[in-house]
Amino acid sequence: MTSEMKKFSKIVLFGLLISPLLASSQTKKDANQKPNIILIMADDLGWTDLSSPNTSLGYGSKYYESPNIDRLAQQGKSFAYAYTQQNCQPTRAALLSGQYATGAQNGVYNVGSLKRASKGVVTPIMPHNQNNYLQEDCVSMFETLKTAGYHTAWFGKFHAIKLGKQAESYMGVDYNVALHKETSATVNGVKVKNEFFAQNDDAKGWMFEIDNLKPYAQPYDAAYLQKVLEPIKNGNNPWLLEGTPKHLTDALGDAVVGYIKDRSKADSPFFAYIPFHAVHVSILPRLDLEAKYKAKKSLDPRHTQADYAAFVELLDQTVGRVLNALEDPNGDGNKADGIAENTMVIFYSDNGGFMGPTNNSPLRLRKGTYYEGGVRVPLIFKYPGVITPNSVNTTQEVHTIDFYPTLAEIAGAKLPSPKVQEMDGKSIASVLREESQVRDDKNELFWHFPGYMDVRNMPQSVIHYRHSDNQHYKLFYRYEDESFELYNLSNDLGETTNLLAENPSQQTLDLALKMNNKLRAWLIKNNAPTGIWAKNCEKVPYPKKDAVKKYIK
């Protein structure tokens, strides 16, 4: 057992020991009390990119620092088996609809298109034509929470919907600060575009892409540094920023803090969705944090890039500001106005880390793939008095599609009728309340990709299955050559050993057959598109019932 795993085991044991004490000592929430809900989503943050041991079974970074998110993990429950789609746009579509990409209101399988094979490669399968946005008849998570009396807000990356008024007109967003990370402006008569930093436009002055963020676009000055960044510094020198353009991540933090201050006085609860653009490429952190990491020696061979480390901590500092605002909304030092005790905070990432800037080891590969490095991410839920602090669920798998029904149950909102919009996700509210460690009827996850994405993805379908003995398995099916891969994730986190590769046992074959039939049934039920063969324009068939028998030798 590694030192990281020993440390993680102690954390789990501590959580088990204190759980009964917490159950008896904490004041139970009123069953009718509606919490505020804050959902924070990082962009491209990998499973091992936090320094907390809770979120990654002890494999957290020894170079990157995330003390504020680590504090959130200590105050809440982390999930070891938390999953997403393979990249950002389909994850965001799944989040807001509660549906896999096969859902009637969804249809978003990839960023941009499924026709993204590497240049010059002739593919045997002609990809499916996907949707690029959620359908306008989609009843979004925002709309459902509004029916329970929630004020809704969106701060950050938009993806999966059309930007602008449509977020308000058919997605149910009351306060809209959704935007790109790029800002276009005319500076000294020249049209320019940059990422992450405010621009000083000749006509508009300091600005980001949308007007709702303009009040927070001014350069860093002494007053801001003293009031905002000095109290949260962590070995960095924020005064290096004086007079430089504002970073988008800080500006979004400013907007969220202002929103919390305003809503803390309201009678109705709020739902704030905060999908930060950090830590997506281009890797452009604040220079004070980059200076810190350039001077710091990495003790983690997986993680050595100073600018990426700085970007992770910039994200972390902004999360810390959000958490601090919940404890002291008006920022006067008196926490009597705090709303943290009645606010659920969730931290999540939209997909696995992008290898190059970071490394997802021990997980296999990266964003864009269905191996664990592409779809397994940190996940934390905090809700004082309901969720046991410093706890880790190492059994229940959770997917993006589960957030919608989970938050609806917590908010006391009714889901859309299945005749209007069928939910693929299932609520894990009972698991959060520790009425059980798992939902017995929630032990399968599916992914389906009817197209191409450079070298990372090809037409395939995948099932994650939790066996009755709580062992987690994952089966891949590739349409081009009708091949399978099977991994035991509980024993082989890095997906290094394909159990079907060499002389599989009868027990292994039986399991693969069972998982294949579950996958096949799901594909048929959802009428999942598969594309057509280029050679004859015929529809690519689903995996055959007994296809895994070819591995019998």
UniProtKB/Swiss-Prot annotation:
Keywords of the record: Calcium, Hydrolase, Metal-binding, Secreted, Signal
Q: For this UniProt entry, what's an example GO CC term?
A: extracellular region
- Active site residues of this protein: 88 (nucleophile), 159
The EC number(s) given in the record are 3.1.6.-
What does the record note about the cofactor? Binds 1 Ca(2+) ion per subunit.
Q: Which Pfam families did the record assign? A: Sulfatase
Q: Which residues bind Ca(2+)?
A: 43-44, 88, 350-351
Against CDD domains, the record matches this protein to: ARS_like
**Metal-binding found in the keyword field:** yes
- Which prosthetic group or cofactor does it need? Ca(2+)
**Belongs to which family?**
Belongs to the sulfatase family.
Name listed for the protein in its UniProt record: Sulfatase
Query: Which organism encodes this protein?
Result: Formosa agariphila (strain DSM 15362 / KCTC 12365 / LMG 23005 / KMM 3901 / M-2Alg 35-1)
